[in-house]
UniProtKB/Swiss-Prot annotation:
UniProt-listed Enzyme Commission number(s): 2.1.1.45
Organism per entry: Shewanella sediminis (strain HAW-EB3)
A single Gene Ontology CC term: cytosol
Subcellular location field: Cytoplasm
Its job: Catalyzes the reductive methylation of 2'-deoxyuridine-5'-monophosphate (dUMP) to 2'-deoxythymidine-5'-monophosphate (dTMP) while utilizing 5,10-methylenetetrahydrofolate (mTHF) as the methyl donor and reductant in the reaction, yielding dihydrofolate (DHF) as a by-product. This enzymatic reaction provides an intracellular de novo source of dTMP, an essential precursor for DNA biosynthesis.
Binding site residues for (6R)-5,10-methylene-5,6,7,8-tetrahydrofolate: D183, S282
Pathway where it operates: Pyrimidine metabolism; dTTP biosynthesis
Protein's recorded name: Thymidylate synthase
Catalytic activity: dUMP + (6R)-5,10-methylene-5,6,7,8-tetrahydrofolate = 7,8-dihydrofolate + dTMP
Active site, per annotation: C160
Segment forming the signal sequence: none
Superkingdom field: Bacteria
């Protein structure tokens, strides 16, 4: 919680007002934030100064792992996070590449599991990473990238958290995750959970020990219609002791994650939190 609260206060104290063209709103913005999560010690970065819907965050990451491109598939897992971008973004609604209701296009996990090649084939980045790590191989390029500028026009949203770089030292697995943009009041609690859980899951299915996860954010911001709630409500609350995350040990392969895993395979214990805060969402 400490590094989360420090970033929120830094944005309020040092941020610059920037006009966001996509949303038509101003954002109080800082550049560069580095957060770390000790996954090996099970220091789960779950926000306690408001209720955090951690199951939705993990469900969304599971959808990325499966390469989903439809908001209905995310809803079936327990995440409604893509409903608005798939169905309420006017630019996407007018896009000829949109296939219909709930279609997200070639975003996030689609790129991670089926990156298009010039010869007409696809690259499954995640499978290559998992296969290498299971064999004890780190080629210094165990990189999962969702950022494909050549296909931005074929999706409803550019990826915010766009790259995950895995590194193996002995039998300990590390993760560096890179995020170009972060809606701190709404998105950061999700993103923290996702970075942590991604390392925990990939370590588990490759037979490695999880180490540290390093989370780099470039543009961290608070929208103008979120500022009062963050400054006058959430930051006035005292944080509780951190919770811990347990993952079903029967999850042993990428195929398991692709087929039968549900939110019932994840459990958070000791989660004390303040009341939920409904921050405005900007499509």
């Amino acid at each position: 919680m400490k590094q989360y609260l420090e970033l929120c206060n830094r944005i309020i104290d040092e941020g610059t007002w920037i006009e966001n063209e996509r949303t038509g709103k101003r954002c109080l913005t800082v550049i560069n934030a580095d957060l770390t999560y000790n996954v090996g010690n099970n220091e789960f970065p779950l926000i306690t100064t408001r209720k955090s819907f951690w199951k939705s965050a993990i469900a969304e990451m599971l959808g990325y792992i499966r390469g989903y491109d439809n908001a209905a598939d995310f809803r079936a897992l327990g995440a409604k996070t893509w409903d608005a971008n798939a169905n309420e973004n006017q630019v996407w609604l007018n896009n000829p590449h949109r296939k219909g209701v709930d279609d997200m296009g070639r975003v996030y996990g689609v790129q991670g599991r089926a990156w298009s090649k010039p010869d007409g084939g696809t690259v499954d980045q995640l499978k290559k990473i998992v296969d290498n790590l299971k064999a004890g191989v780190d080629d210094r390029g165990e990189i999962l990238s969702f950022y494909n500028p050549g296909e931005f026009h074929m999706g409803c949203l550019r990826p915010c958290m766009h790259t995950h770089n895995f590194s193996l030292l002995g039998d300990t697995l590390y993760l560096n995750s890179f995020q170009r943009s972060c809606d701190v009041p709404l998105g950061l609690n999700f993103n923290q959970v996702q970075v942590y859980t991604l390392l925990a899951l990939i370590a588990q299915i490759t037979g490695k020990k999880p180490g540290m996860a390093y989370h780099k954010i470039v543009n961290a911001h608070i929208y103008e219609d979120q500022l009062a709630l963050m400054r006058d409500v959430q930051l006035k609350r005292e944080p509780f002791e951190p919770a811990s995350l347990s993952i079903n040990p029967d999850i042993k392969s990428l195929e398991d994650l692709e087929t039968w895993v549900t939110m019932d395979d994840f459990e958070v214990s000791g989660y004390q939190h303040h009341e939920a805060i409904k921050y405005p969402f900007s499509v």
